[in-house]
Amino acid sequence: MPELPEVETTRRGIAPHLEGQRVSRVVVRDRRLRWPIPEDLDVRLSGQRIVSVERRAKYLLINAEVGTLISHLGMSGNLRLVELGLPAAKHEHVDIELESGLMLRYTDPRRFGAMLWSLDPLNHELLLRLGPEPLTDLFDGERLFQLSRGRSMAVKPFIMDNAVVVGVGNIYATEALFAAGIDPRREAGGISRARYLKLAIEIKRVLAAAIEQGGTTLRDFIGGDGQPGYFQQELFVYGRGGQPCKVCGTALREVKLGQRASVYCPRCQR
């Protein structure tokens, strides 16, 4: 599933080609995504100029002069720029044609993504209750410490809760916990303030590094420019269960936490 760095990579790839451009037509070949694409999307968006492309959590917000297209890539979706008129292949559900001669094409083999229209996106039900962005000053270790008090759940699903902080998905939660030396199974409410301060720093560092590397290519992800991400080469623990730790050589262990695989080093993480 594309996580925050992959979505931010997509935003950075498509924004320069969309902002300031006028939409000439929207072609929807299949409306059956996680939620049906609005039947009047072509009418609402065609003829409008795109003002900006923003990201909130893992949602892309394509802001037009009036209204916003809210897009989510789901489990296997991607948005990329192609030449106008390029024939569509299987699973290529939507084309947003631009007067510049390019079009933004949405591909989603599993159809778990979304394309919705809103006149007030930040108050849309999908975005209204989201926590702070992890790379802003609104997120820090003190927030983690305060929100964790009295919580008996494991620390990994705690930091993956979008009400706590957005965009810390499975890959980056796994890597940040390793970097902070925290066992992902530890009870969230039992971790000290000092360790949460360290964890918040590592969450920011890991996410920033992943964005600079263009995200992590695992199975389906490609960026808005059609290029893969390279952060997979930097992974210390994610997807490496049973292999030796790159720091101490101890065999990494894999457990299930919140229905997700979690890999950790029993020596480096306490």
Curated annotation (Swiss-Prot):
The keyword NAD does not apply. Its EC number is 3.2.2.23, 4.2.99.18. DNA binds at residues 91, 110, 151. The active site is at 2 (schiff-base intermediate with dna), 3 (proton donor), 58 (proton donor), 260 (proton donor). Its cofactor is Zn(2+). A zinc finger (FPG-type) spans 236-270. It catalyses: Hydrolysis of DNA containing ring-opened 7-methylguanine residues, releasing 2,6-diamino-4-hydroxy-5-(N-methyl)formamidopyrimidine; 2'-deoxyribonucleotide-(2'-deoxyribose 5'-phosphate)-2'-deoxyribonucleotide-DNA = a 3'-end 2'-deoxyribonucleotide-(2,3-dehydro-2,3-deoxyribose 5'-phosphate)-DNA + a 5'-end 5'-phospho-2'-deoxyribonucleoside-DNA + H(+). One of its GO terms (biological process) is base-excision repair. Binds 1 zinc ion per subunit. Involved in base excision repair of DNA damaged by oxidation or by mutagenic agents. Acts as a DNA glycosylase that recognizes and removes damaged bases. Has a preference for oxidized purines, such as 7,8-dihydro-8-oxoguanine (8-oxoG). Has AP (apurinic/apyrimidinic) lyase activity and introduces nicks in the DNA strand. Cleaves the DNA backbone by beta-delta elimination to generate a single-strand break at the site of the removed base with both 3'- and 5'-phosphates. Monomer. This is Formamidopyrimidine-DNA glycosylase. It comes from Pseudomonas putida (strain GB-1). The gene is mutM.
